[in-house]
Amino acid sequence: MKASLLNKLDNLSDRFEELTALLGDAEVISKQTQFRAYSKEYAEIEPVIATFRELRKVQSDLEGAQALLKESDPDLREMAEEEVAQAKEALTTLEDKLQRMLLPKDPNDGRNVYLEVRAGTGGDEAAIFSGDLFRMYSRYAEKQGWRVEVLSANEGEHGGFKEVIARVEGDNVYAKLKFESGAHRVQRVPETESQGRIHTSACTVAVLPEPDEQAAIEINPADLRVDTYRSSGAGGQHVNTTDSAIRITHIPTGTVVECQEERSQHKNRAKAMAWLAAKLQDQQEAAAHKEISETRKLLVGSGDRSERIRTYNFPQGRVTDHRINLTLYSLSEVMAGGVEAVIEPLLAEYQADQLAALGD
């Protein structure tokens, strides 16, 4: 293991001892905010320290076994050789585990997200596929125990959505969905196609982390134009006699958000403002992320909304993620909500990319 990583682990060990003492201090215990902060830090460090201590023990066992290799007794040497081999194998496993534990954490991983699915090229078929994609993510969310709340939906003339925006709430939503942003292409025979020809259509997906309330971007009310209109689509039959739907335009950036799913204009406005904050924060972070990507070209996670990331080929039952050259012939399972078959390899590849950067 690199000296810099060992030094970092030694520093973490010192901090862990310090936190242990602080959490037993009566004065700290009486200050709930401080106590919670220390407890959270302790919980994050504790698994790393436990693994580091295990590594130190294995290193000690290895040194002891290597010393026995010098013994004249052949049976003792044979036993020592086995112990050395086992210790070296355990050491490699623990070093790899520790390196992964020390990878930089994405501060947004634990956040809820705003999921945007929009029809691109392909007309009615693109809208229908947008509906299929949104259904895929909704079923995946259900399997994860997440909650999906539609904020705005513009339905297609023949089904699906021209655009659908939803808030997805649960544990580690952004961590799982953050690499879904980009252009998704579908190849299939549309229901409206009489001659059986395969058409190619596209949709774009954007996944934006919901900002922390305390760290949320400041928005000047003078920079906003707020329009109200009568709601349509889901729930519209209940509220279409009043202007309950809200459209907010952030004038400096031209960013527009709207929410029409609640019967209350006040609730729609609150949800639209939260979504606007997420979009503005995403725009700010995109510039910084672009610099990182250009410095060291990331295999996944470029975040480019226009980048074609995946193809769904229905005649072949194939789904291909172009970023990691992953091809699966289980399209029906993926579309039924089993998208983890694509997400998990993406996350593994990203982690490998981080490990490579750690070694540079």
Curated annotation (Swiss-Prot):
Disulfide bonds: none annotated. Gene3D superfamilies: 3.30.160.20, 3.30.70.1660, 6.10.140.1950. Peptide chain release factor 1 directs the termination of translation in response to the peptide chain termination codons UAG and UAA. Its main location: cytoplasm. This is Peptide chain release factor 1. Pfam families: PCRF (PF03462), RF-1 (PF00472). SMART domains: PCRF. Keywords: Cytoplasm, Methylation, Protein biosynthesis. PROSITE patterns: RF_PROK_I. It comes from the Bacteria. GO terms for cellular component: cytoplasm. Belongs to the prokaryotic/mitochondrial release factor family. HAMAP family: Rel_fac_1 (MF_00093). InterPro entries: PCRF (IPR005139), Pep_chain_release_fac_I (IPR000352), Pep_chain_release_fac_I_sf (IPR045853), Prokaryotic/Mito_RF (IPR050057), RF-1 (IPR004373). It is found in: Cytoplasm. Signal peptide: none annotated. The modification N5-methylglutamine is found at Q237. One of its GO terms (molecular function) is translation release factor activity, codon specific. Methylated by PrmC. Methylation increases the termination efficiency of RF1.
